[in-house]
């Protein structure tokens, strides 16, 4: 096997160094990245919840975020909601907010099974729960969680 020829740059004292760049040294980088920041939304059903909102918990409200870099989109939905019911619509995003259907599990109280959240290309964000929990879910039971996907 042959050796690959390396060239090292040397500083003024003759010491080798590896040149790298810093994000601040790239002109126009801001124009390549678009960030919506966290956009809070009011659920159409259910109630915004206060779970995990103590100073130490640093919990969040129902919100979403989109970050675009070149042709890549990173999307996140965060939920903190109580007073929910089986099959209810949580929110209606614009059409194509999600190009493909997305589903994920979120946290619930310890005496409940996880709840499945579904987001459809139509923009409908809804939930479903296990049949064991459907009839006796109480107002102060909550869902809490976030989900991120790449398009």
Name these PLM-found stretches.
Residues 40, 53-107:
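Beta-rich globular "head" domains
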